Amino acid sequence: MYEAAVAHYLATGKRSFLDIAIKSANLLCETFGPEEGKITVAPGHQEVEIGLVKLYRVTGDKRYLDLSQFFLDARGKYDKYDRSSEDQFRNGAYWQDHKPVLEQDEAVGHAVRATYKRRTL
């Protein structure tokens, strides 16, 4: 949604969709992060990180950039996975959460995630 809202805003200059995306991103910023009482895990899709960066670029709100970085840094740190399992759901690979982003050298998990890996290289 964030990428679409930014594209719509850049193409039309209209803020209606962008304002909805901002409201949603603000909720993410209030809910996720390293601070006490917030959820400290990475989302299942890296799409949110890309979208938050694009929102930052059009709004200048650094919270979006910071949250995107937090999500990327959180990958590979969730301690409830069974890292020895070959099952991608049990070891975190399905969600690209099996090891830190900078250590991921191949696209794994659901096929849609291959585009995120390629876009970030």
What is each residue range found by the language model?
Residues 2-121:
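Glycan-recognition and catalytic cores of secretory/periplasmic carbohydrate-active enzymes
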